[in-house]
From Swiss-Prot:
CDD domains: IMPCH
Matches recorded under PANTHER family: BIFUNCTIONAL PURINE BIOSYNTHESIS PROTEIN ATIC, BIFUNCTIONAL PURINE BIOSYNTHESIS PROTEIN PURH
Transferase recorded as keyword: yes
Organismal lineage: Bacteria, Pseudomonadati, Pseudomonadota, Gammaproteobacteria, Enterobacterales
Catalytic activity: (6R)-10-formyltetrahydrofolate + 5-amino-1-(5-phospho-beta-D-ribosyl)imidazole-4-carboxamide = 5-formamido-1-(5-phospho-D-ribosyl)imidazole-4-carboxamide + (6S)-5,6,7,8-tetrahydrofolate; IMP + H2O = 5-formamido-1-(5-phospho-D-ribosyl)imidazole-4-carboxamide
InterPro entries hit by this protein: AICAR_Tfase_dup_dom_sf, Cytidine_deaminase-like, MGS-like_dom, MGS-like_dom_sf, PurH-like
Gene Ontology cellular component list: cytosol
TM region positions: none
MGS-like domain sequence ranges: 1-148
A GO biological-process term: 'de novo' IMP biosynthetic process
Name the UniProt record assigns to this protein: Bifunctional purine biosynthesis protein PurH
Length: 529
C-alpha cells in the first residue's frame, strides 16, 4: 500500500488566488483546518470560511510591511517535523503538524516585465517566506504535500476522496518535484534580472547589460515527448518557454492530424518565421528547414499555386505556411495536388478543416495573427557550451538600399529584389534565391561555395521550365569573387541584391556593369547555419 498521509491541517498563502476559495471550501468540507496569511486569509474569511491567521497561530505579528510573516519555528517546525521522529520536540514547543502547504509566489516576472519597473519595485516582489515554505514542504514530502499549481487542486481533492482524506507518497513526491521546479524557475528569473544589471554598475548601458548576463538561467516546460528525434535512434522532447509573446510554433494549436514529429516542429518553425516577413498574402513551402517555394499574391490560393510551381518535387511531403486564414478553396487545392506533412496558418475556416480532415495524416495548426516581431535571443548548442545571439530581425527598406552599379534597377526589379532578399534570410548558407514577379523561381541552399548555390538555383528553375531571364537574385552574404555574377548573367539574371563588403567588391561591381546587371547593396548580412 502507498504510504498515505491524512491531511488535517493546511497552510494557504497565494499570490494567484484563482481557484483558492473553491479549494479551501473543499478542504474545509473534508475537515481540514485552515491556516493562512494576509490577503489570502482575508479573502477566505470574507467567504465565510473558518481560517486562522498565521500571526494568531504563532503569537507573532506580521511585520515590516509583510516582509516577515511565516518565518517562524511554529510554521517551519510544523512543515519540517518528521512524523514519528520529531513528535516529542514538536509537542514540547507547541508546534502543530502542517500536512499541506498551498503557496504560489509573488509575481516577480510580471513585475519586471512592466514598463517603468524600478529596482525597488522588483526587490519588493522577491518572495522570501513563500519559497522557504515551498522548499521546506518539498523536502519533507514524505509527510507533507506541497501545492504550487492551481491546476492540481481538483486532482488533490479527488485523491483525498478516494483515500479517506489522505494523499499517497507518489502524489506527494510528484508535487515536490513541481515545487522544486517552481522555486528553481523563480530564482532563475531573479538571478537573470539582477545578473543583467551587474555590468550596468560598471558603466555599460543597461540595454547591452540586459542581453547577456554573467550566468544565463533558462527555464523551459516540456510540452510533449517525441516518438524520436531527428533520427530514429535519438530520443527527443519539445520544450517551450512560458509567457511567449509572439505567435509561434510553440504557441500553435494543433486542430487535426497525428502527433508532430521533431522534424515537423523544426520545419514548421522555419516556414512560419519566413512567412511572417510578408505583409501581402503569402505562402511558404519548406523542406528540411529550407524554403523550396515562396510567393506573395492577392490571395493565398494564388500564392500557394505559385510557391508550389517553384519546386513541386521538393514540395512533396513539405510544410506549408500562410499568413492569412486557410480557406476551403486553398485547402482543396493542397489536398488535391500534393502530400503535405503540416499546414500552419493564423486560423482555418470550418470548411477548410472539413476538407483537410479527409487526409488523416495531415497536421493542421493555427497560431493566431501576429503583430510586431518580438526581440529575443537565439541559441545554438555546441559541445560543452551554448552560443547566444540576438534574434535576426534585421530588415531593409527600399530607402535603405544602395545601388552600386551603373544601371539602376527598374521598379519591378526592385520589388523582386526586396522579395527574394526576405526569402534568402531563411535559406541555409550559402544561400542564393532567384525571384520574378513576387515568386521564387530557383533556390540554391547550403552549398560550401556561393557560385554553386547560384548554379543550383539556375538548374532548379530550368528543371521546372521557369523563365529566369529578367529575374532578380539575392545572396545572403557578399560575393567573394565575380564568378557568382558571371553564373547569374549566364542564365539571364538582370538584378542582384547582396550585402556587399568583400575586398573584391570593385571586381564584383565591374562584373555586374559588364553584364548590364543592376546591383544593390543592403549593408546587412543574413548568414544562416
Amino acid at each position: 500500500m502507498q504510504q498515505r498521509r491524512p491531511v488535517r491541517r493546511a497552510l494557504l498563502s497565494v499570490s494567484d488566488k484563482a481557484g483558492i476559495v473553491e479549494f479551501a471550501q473543499a478542504l474545509t468540507a473534508r475537515g481540514v483546518e485552515l491556516l493562512s496569511t494576509g490577503g489570502t486569509a482575508r479573502l477566505l474569511a470574507d467567504k465565510g470560511l473558518p481560517v486562522t491567521e498565521v500571526s494568531d497561530y504563532t503569537g507573532f505579528p506580521e511585520m515590516m510591511d509583510g516582509r516577515v510573516k511565516t518565518l517562524h519555528p511554529k510554521v517551519h517546525g510544523g512543515i519540517l517535523g518528521r512524523r514519528g521522529q520529531d513528535d516529542g520536540i514538536m509537542q514540547q514547543h507547541g508546534i502543530a503538524p502542517i500536512d499541506m502547504v498551498v503557496v504560489n509566489l509573488y509575481p516577480f516576472a510580471q513585475t519586471v516585465a512592466r514598463e517603468g519597473c524600478s529596482l525597488e519595485d522588483a526587490v519588493e516582489n522577491i518572495d522570501i517566506g513563500g519559497p522557504t515554505m515551498v522548499r521546506s514542504a518539498a523536502k519533507n514530502h514524505k509527510d507533507v504535500a506541497i501545492v504550487v499549481k492551481s491546476s492540481d487542486y481538483d486532482a488533490i481533492i479527488n485523491e483525498m476522496d478516494a483515500n479517506e482524506g489522505s494523499l499517497t507518497l507518489n502524489t506527494r513526491f510528484d508535487l515536490a518535484i513541481k515545487a522544486f521546479e517552481h522555486t528553481a524557475a523563480y530564482d532563475s528569473m531573479i538571478a537573470n534580472y539582477f545578473g543583467s544589471m551587474v555590468p550596468a554598475y560598471h558603466g555599460e548601458s543597461q540595454e547591452a547589460a540586459g542581453r547577456f548576463p554573467r550566468t544565463l538561467n533558462l527555464n523551459f516546460i516540456k510540452k510533449q515527448d517525441m516518438r524520436y528525434g531527428e533520427n530514429s535512434h535519438q530520443q527527443a522532447a519539445f520544450y517551450i518557454e512560458e509567457n511567449v509573446k509572439e505567435a509561434s510554433v510553440a504557441t500553435a494549436t494543433q486542430l487535426q492530424g497525428k502527433a508532430l514529429s521533431y522534424n515537423n516542429i523544426a520545419d514548421t518553425d522555419a516556414a512560419l518565421e519566413c512567412v511572417k516577413e510578408f505583409n501581402e498574402p503569402a505562402c511558404v513551402i519548406v523542406k528540411h528547414a529550407n524554403p523550396c517555394g515562396v510567393a506573395v499574391s492577392n490571395s493565398i490560393l494564388d500564392a500557394y499555386d505559385r510557391a508550389y510551381k517553384t519546386d513541386p518535387t521538393s514540395a512533396f511531403g513539405g510544410i506549408i505556411a500562410f499568413n492569412r486564414e486557410l480557406d476551403a478553396e486553398t485547402a482543396q487545392a493542397i489536398i488535391s495536388r500534393q502530400f503535405v506533412e503540416v499546414i500552419i496558418a493564423p486560423s482555418a475556416s470550418e470548411e477548410a478543416l472539413k476538407i483537410t480532415a479527409a487526409k488523416q495524416n495531415v497536421r493542421v495548426l493555427t497560431c493566431g495573427q501576429w503583430d510586431a516581431r518580438v526581440a529575443g535571443l537565439d541559441f545554438k548548442r555546441v559541445n560543452g557550451g551554448l552560443l547566444v545571439q540576438d534574434r535576426d530581425l534585421g530588415m531593409v527598406t527600399a530607402g535603405e538600399l544602395r545601388v552600386v552599379s551603373k544601371r539602376q534597377p527598374s521598379e519591378q526589379e526592385l520589388r523582386d529584389a526586396l522579395f527574394c532578399w526576405k526569402v534568402a534570410k531563411f535559406v541555409k548558407s550559402n544561400a542564393i534565391v532567384y525571384a520574378k514577379d513576387n515568386m521564387t523561381i530557383g533556390i540554391g541552399a547550403g552549398q560550401m561555395s556561393r557560385v554553386y548555390s547560384a548554379k543550383i538555383a539556375g538548374i532548379k528553375a530550368g528543371d521546372e521550365g521557369l523563365e529566369v531571364k529578367g529575374s532578380a537574385m539575392a545572396s545572403d552574404a557578399f560575393f567573394p569573387f565575380r564568378d557568382g555574377i558571371d553564373a547569374a548573367a549566364a542564365v539571364g539574371i538582370t538584378c542582384v541584391i547582396q550585402p556587399g563588403g568583400s575586398i573584391r567588391d570593385d571586381e564584383v561591381i565591374a562584373a555586374a556593369d559588364e553584364h548590364g546587371i543592376a546591383m544593390i547593396f543592403t549593408d546587412m548580412r543574413h548568414f544562416r547555419h
